Amino acid sequence: NIDWHRRYSHMRMHTAQHLMSGLAYEIFNGVRTVGNQIHSTHSRIDFNPISFDQTMLDELSSSANELTNQSIEITNSIMTREQINAIMPEDRTNMNLLPKSVKNLRVVKIGENVDLCPCAGTHVTNLEEVGSVNIISKKSKGKGTQRVTYELGEPIRTISPNLDII
């Protein structure tokens, strides 16, 4: 049996990670996501190169929360490397980490221009399902890397186990 509550929490957290990674890249001049870990109650993202101050963290969370209050669709599709690279810079998608022999990739896309990234994970279908993003800590991981930990507030809408929108 699938624990729907836990699965759905992971879907929300994972989508929030994509959102935060995409926003951080745009807001902070190409900062990259170099690691992440998704849990059902909190998650973390490692960014590099960056040294966040509180103003920067506030800007990141407020930008994320502005979007999670909007009905922005999240889709999955199969794309070629060339199609992905034509839309997003290779360093943003971490395409260099994938074997060159992999030609077609599953991608998650948030809205038209929020984020597009190769990913085989599970995600919600709309940003309104994520809830508010609350950054709860930051920690230096050395060599210009900072770890940001976040949790999520209640979403505007949810999906029940039988896929009804509530």
Task: Show where each model-derived region lies.
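Active-/binding-site microenvironments in catalytic and ligand-binding cores
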Residues: N1-I166
